[in-house]
Amino acid sequence: MNVTAPELSERQRRILRLVVEEYVTTGQPVGSKALVERGGIDVSPSTVRNEFAALEALGLLMHPHTSAGRVPTERGYRLYAGSVLERMEARPGAFPLDLTSVRREVDDALQATTEMLSRVTSLLALVSAPPLETTTVRRVEVLLLQPDVVMVLVITSTGGVTKRVAAFDNAVDPGLAAWASEYLNDRVAGLTLGSGLLRQRLADPELAAQERRFLETLRPAFSGAAEDEQRLYVGGAAGLFDEVREGEFASYRRLLEILEQRAALLELLRGSLDPRRPFVRVGAELEHPELSNVALVGAAYGLAYRTLGTVSLLGPVRMDYDKAIRSVHSAAAELSRFVEDVYDEH
């Protein structure tokens, strides 16, 4: 989040913070008299109005035509969120995510994280799965469903399960299906999805012609598993419109449309990623003109030596940044501890 902070007095910073937090809570423009009456600043309403004018001149507040109050601009939100990042310290237990009861599967942990994040923040939660090059084949099962129908199960190191069904022109020899299971678990299990070595093992020239043809028919199960691993877990879409204010509906509708474009969302998350600390992108920083009223808050999770993915929240620019930033930071830390344990086991 690259925000060139204007020179503000301590009082101006305080007033900006109070305006943002009040507007986030109420969705209504904030007036000088109301700000003083609610406490938090010991100056007169006229002094607050003067500071409002100064902050407006700096492009941090704006004055809606129908109200005497002020609301934050995108730049104001960015500056406020930047101040939250600067003063943020990890708070143990700040986010109620407990993965101790989750099965030792990364997929389950990612799903649990999105569900809890969306429930706690009332925002759209996005968690990206580990990249393909970190995912291996754990086990393969080749099952004869009917004399001429075979189902292949590919179970990955993240706990993902891909099923593919192949129909043959003639009955399949049960011995061939049993051989395929044994061969794949012996020669393919442990290999990285999408790797050249995996593809070579599926087309080993030393195999008999019948065996190679059979494995060729099963190949889509492995390419399908690779595609499935490019996953984005989403939570909270059903409640996305619960607190939308007038003027925000168009951006929210567009947000739901973009949810259908998982590849674009994954690219957005990768482009925003900062492995060192939580990140915030507001409005135009998302580089989607239709998302001018939307903000993204996220944090990286992973192993000590590499980043595996992101834990993110999407919502209105009028969001509780303090809560959102602390939530993704705590959730990413907990998820990192989980995957460290799981990857150590493998």
Name these PLM-found stretches.
Residues 78-87, 91-312, 316-346:
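Intrinsically disordered, acidic Ser/Thr/Pro-rich low-complexity regulatory segments
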Residues 2-4, 61-66, 318:
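A short glycine/serine-rich beta->alpha loop
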Residues 8, 28, 244:
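Residue-level marker of regulatory loop/turn positions in helix-turn-helix DNA-binding domains and
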Residues 1-17:
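Short alpha-helical segments that sit at the start of domains
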Residues 6-7, 42, 71, 171:
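Short, conserved sequence motifs enriched in acidic/basic residues, glycine, and aromatics
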Residues 19, 25, 29-84:
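N-terminal helix-turn-helix
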